[in-house]
């Protein structure tokens, strides 16, 4: 069966899915971009949950992910994934980004979540080239979904049409659109 992957232009904090992914920083304490938006929309409970995780485990290393409550968000949970900072591509950034996506998918599956929404991890202040990051995201997610029953559906939530078109083109090229 073909993986169920959709591209959406919009605000990830309003997605009515089981779990959303936060492009977090290692401190898990919120920040700019999507990280700050998710923390603001979720309310103080999310920061408290992140503080607890940090006290138990320390910082979250690049490529890793942790799961928390969602606070005031419509989602049931938030998976905080730390992607790599782009350093030119010679420091295992691609592998680290792939690991971040895989660890999110594994956490969602382990918790029985059927629907998952991803932002474009590492493409903001971390500077990962958007096209290369989209390719890693689409390939990693589609490969995982063909081998595992959960999650059943994944959304790539893009903040603008330009980014969404990158993902949509990749889905078409790989025959992953519903009509392909």
From Swiss-Prot:
<dbReference type="InterPro" id="IPR024900">
    <property type="entry name" value="O-Ac-ADP-ribose_deAcase"/>
</dbReference>
<feature type="binding site">
    <location>
        <begin position="122"/>
        <end position="126"/>
    </location>
    <ligand>
        <name>substrate</name>
    </ligand>
</feature>
<dbReference type="InterPro" id="IPR043472">
    <property type="entry name" value="Macro_dom-like"/>
</dbReference>
<feature type="binding site">
    <location>
        <begin position="11"/>
        <end position="12"/>
    </location>
    <ligand>
        <name>substrate</name>
    </ligand>
</feature>
<dbReference type="Pfam" id="PF01661">
    <property type="entry name" value="Macro"/>
</dbReference>
<feature type="active site" description="Proton acceptor">
    <location>
        <position position="35"/>
    </location>
</feature>
<protein>
    <recommendedName>
        <fullName>O-acetyl-ADP-ribose deacetylase</fullName>
        <ecNumber>3.1.1.106</ecNumber>
    </recommendedName>
</protein>
<comment type="function">
    <text>Deacetylates O-acetyl-ADP ribose to yield ADP-ribose and free acetate. Down-regulates ribonuclease 3 (RNase III) activity. Acts by interacting directly with the region of the ribonuclease that is required for dimerization/activation.</text>
</comment>
<dbReference type="InterPro" id="IPR002589">
    <property type="entry name" value="Macro_dom"/>
</dbReference>
<dbReference type="GO" id="GO:0042278">
    <property type="term" value="P:purine nucleoside metabolic process"/>
</dbReference>
<dbReference type="GO" id="GO:0008428">
    <property type="term" value="F:ribonuclease inhibitor activity"/>
</dbReference>
<feature type="binding site">
    <location>
        <position position="25"/>
    </location>
    <ligand>
        <name>substrate</name>
    </ligand>
</feature>
<keyword id="KW-0378">Hydrolase</keyword>
<comment type="subunit">
    <text>Homodimer. Interacts with RNase III.</text>
</comment>
<dbReference type="GO" id="GO:0061463">
    <property type="term" value="F:O-acetyl-ADP-ribose deacetylase activity"/>
</dbReference>
<feature type="binding site">
    <location>
        <begin position="33"/>
        <end position="35"/>
    </location>
    <ligand>
        <name>substrate</name>
    </ligand>
</feature>
<comment type="similarity">
    <text>Belongs to the MacroD-type family. YmdB subfamily.</text>
</comment>
<feature type="domain" description="Macro">
    <location>
        <begin position="1"/>
        <end position="175"/>
    </location>
</feature>
<dbReference type="GO" id="GO:0001883">
    <property type="term" value="F:purine nucleoside binding"/>
</dbReference>
């Amino acid at each position: 069966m073909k993986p169920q992957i959709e591209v959406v232009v919009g605000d990830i904090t309003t997605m009515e899915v089981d779990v959303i992914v936060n492009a977090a920083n290692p401190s898990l304490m919120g920040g700019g971009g999507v990280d700050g938006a998710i923390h603001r929309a979720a309310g103080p409970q999310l920061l408290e949950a992140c503080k607890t995780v940090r006290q138990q485990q320390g910082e979250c290393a690049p490529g890793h992910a942790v799961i928390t409550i969602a606070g005031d968000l419509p989602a049931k949970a938030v998976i905080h994934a730390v992607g790599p900072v782009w350093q030119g591509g010679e420091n295992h950034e691609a592998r680290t980004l792939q690991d971040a996506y895989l660890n999110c998918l594994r956490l969602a599956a382990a918790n029985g979540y059927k629907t998952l929404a991803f932002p474009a991890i590492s493409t903001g202040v971390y500077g990962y080239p958007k096209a290369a990051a989209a390719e890693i995201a689409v390939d990693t997610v589609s490969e995982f979904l063909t081998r595992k029953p959960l999650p059943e559906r994944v959304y790539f939530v893009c903040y603008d049409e330009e980014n969404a078109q990158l993902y949509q083109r990749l889905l078409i090229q790989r025959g992953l659109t519903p009509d392909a």
